[in-house]
Amino acid sequence: MSPETLRHSQRSAVHRLRLLTVNTHKGFTFFNRRFILPELRDAVRILSTELVFLQEVHGAHQSHALRWKDWPPTPQYEFLADSMWPEFAYGRNAVYPDGDHGNALLSKFPILAFHNHDVAIGDHEMRGLLHAELDVPGERAVHAVCVHLGLQEHHRQKQLRLLCRLLSGLPVDAAVIVAGDFNDWRCKADATLAECGLHEVFTRAHGAPAKSFPARWPLLPLDRVYLRNCSGHEARVLTRRPWSHLSDHAPLAVEVHL
């Protein structure tokens, strides 16, 4: 790297970025009574974070498109990205006759590459790890992994080991952000992921993971933000209106210092 290029990199380097992670419940309220994806998009846009980690987002659903008048003509993740997040990646986890759903990542930074890792254990629950490499200005690579793990503890433990295997293949000095719905109500993930260098933002700041489910009366700590080679600040659980009525999970918002 030439001195001029180095100076340019230092001037334009990004040292902080904001993220949001939310299980969208496929765009419906808790008991599937209303389709509220347009309202969710408005709320997410107001925060204007650099990264958005989405779980349970539809790529397509033919019968819903016929039933709900506000159903978008594009995949849900594209509808949510709109003009705010020019880059997005989608990892299809479940496919059925009417359509599909999975994880998605919205980014204000270029996505250099992405891959969806199938971590389903058996045929009952389709789960995935959506891994993306981001072109964030600075001296280190930034990797993001959007996670949705299974409902059974022994499935989750196997999936956490698969996540650690994925992370072991990344550059040792890369900044790594892992966020999503871990379904880890028994709080077993922290110890497993500490072995591969991750720390959980809310646990480090407050001594315990954030309670995020159900959104209206959060009792269970299902959602997480884990980091490696970077630090989390201003960690918040968004439990007030409108968030408490936009999904069955309360979103988590964090500022990451690279």
Where is each model-derived feature located?
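Short loop/turn segments at strand-loop or loop-helix junctions that form parts
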Residues: 22, 55-58
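Short active-site-proximal "capping" loops at secondary-structure junctions
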Residues: 57-62, 95-96
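Extracytoplasmic small-molecule ligand-binding "clamshell" domains
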Residues: 75-76, 80
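Active-site regions of metal-assisted phosphoester/phosphodiester hydrolases
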Residues: 1-51, 82-83, 87-258
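Short, flexible/disordered intra-domain loops and linkers
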Residues: 29-34, 60-73
